[in-house]
């Protein structure tokens, strides 16, 4: 995945290094174009973000796509360095400040996303990941969000410990893996003038389909994804419950063996014989490896995201239904008159 970095000097993570992200309209259009092109092929679009940091504001001024992973002859790191070197020659911002990727059905949180952002954020302190939801944007809602790993998530990855105890000690949950950074889009005055002129050229019957009710496929996709994630979380819960049962059984057998050894040692002591150390019994019971809970945490976050999207979608659809009903009643009343 996108575990590439333009700078390799490792820096210490500081909290609230970036207050908000400012993205140029040109960079947004290039990201949108790339993500929609790849979505037609059911591929995940990824690319690099270029810009600079000014007073805790990350300004994204340009971007370029990563080569497709299927091309084995392509040296991805050399490709990025070559692109940034050529941008520098034409006096374009060439500092690597993060990466972007597409998302479908709001399902952006994944293990690959966490790993990639960890590599970026530990090598480029101010880096962010920008996620573009192609499906939601295609319905007329520009969905562009910027995220950074929280200090707790960074520390957890550095320790490499994903056990339940580590999650509890660091107070890490699916809601605290990423911190969303506010993102604003800035256009030049000339761009704003052009947008105003294009808006006047738009036909009146275009761009106003706000009461479109043909959105059953959106809810269906969200529900299907939600069911799949719930099933995955159930399988994770079954595996963890089996681990707990094995640990409980092992502890019971160990306590029984230690109690038996204590009784035997008491008899040996009364006979003046040497006792057997408890270490001999403990060695027979090897500790069970604790299963990692990172996958279950990510799956829980995906379930929460789908549930929020379904709730938002249903509330919007209900509002459309009530508005449409009122308009239909008004139309029928007018026809009767």
From Swiss-Prot:
GO biological process: formation of cytoplasmic translation initiation complex; positive regulation of Notch signaling pathway
Pfam families named in the record: eIF3h_C, JAB
Stored Gene3D superfamilies: Cytidine Deaminase, domain 2
Stored PROSITE patterns: MPN (PS50249)
Main localization of the protein described in the UniProt heading: cytoplasm
HAMAP family the UniProt entry points to: eIF3h
Protein name in UniProt: Eukaryotic translation initiation factor 3 subunit H
Phylogenetic placement of the source organism: Eukaryota, Metazoa, Ecdysozoa, Arthropoda, Hexapoda
């Amino acid at each position: 995945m996108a575990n590439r970095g333009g700078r390799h000097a490792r820096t210490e993570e500081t909290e609230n290094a970036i207050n908000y992200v400012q993205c140029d309209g040109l960079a947004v259009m290039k990201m949108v174009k790339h993500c929609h092109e790849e979505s037609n092929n059911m591929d995940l679009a990824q690319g690099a973000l270029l810009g600079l940091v000014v007073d805790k504001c990350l300004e994204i001024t340009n971007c370029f796509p990563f080569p497709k992973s299927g091309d084995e002859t392509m040296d991805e790191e050399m490709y990025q360095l070559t692109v940034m070197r050529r941008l520098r020659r034409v006096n374009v911002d060439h500092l690597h400040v993060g990466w972007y990727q597409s998302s479908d059905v709001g399902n952006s949180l994944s293990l690959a996303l966490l790993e990639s952002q960890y590599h970026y954020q530990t090598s480029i302190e101010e880096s962010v990941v920008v996620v573009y939801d192609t499906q939601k944007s295609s319905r007329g809602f520009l969905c562009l969000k910027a995220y950074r790993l929280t200090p707790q998530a960074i520390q957890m990855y550095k320790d490499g410990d994903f056990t339940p105890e580590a999650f509890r000690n660091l107070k890490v949950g699916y809601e605290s893996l990423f911190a969303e950074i506010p993102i604003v889009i800035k256009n030049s005055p000339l761009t704003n003038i052009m947008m105003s002129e294009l808006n006047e050229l738009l036909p009146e019957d275009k761009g106003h389909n706000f009461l479109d009710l043909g959105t059953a496929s959106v809810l269906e996709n969200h529900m299907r994804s939600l069911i799949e994630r719930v099933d995955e979380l159930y399988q994770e819960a079954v595996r963890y419950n089996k681990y707990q049962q094995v640990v409980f059984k092992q502890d019971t057998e160990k306590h029984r063996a230690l109690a038996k050894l204590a009784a035997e040692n008491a008899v040996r002591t009364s006979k003046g014989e040497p006792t057997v150390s408890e270490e001999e019994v403990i060695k027979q019971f090897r500790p069970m490896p604790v299963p990692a809970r990172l996958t279950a945490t990510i799956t829980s976050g995906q379930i929460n995201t789908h549930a929020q999207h379904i709730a938002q979608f249903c509330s919007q659809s209900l509002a459309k239904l009530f508005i449409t009903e009122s308009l239909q009643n008004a139309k029928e009343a007018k026809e009767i008159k």
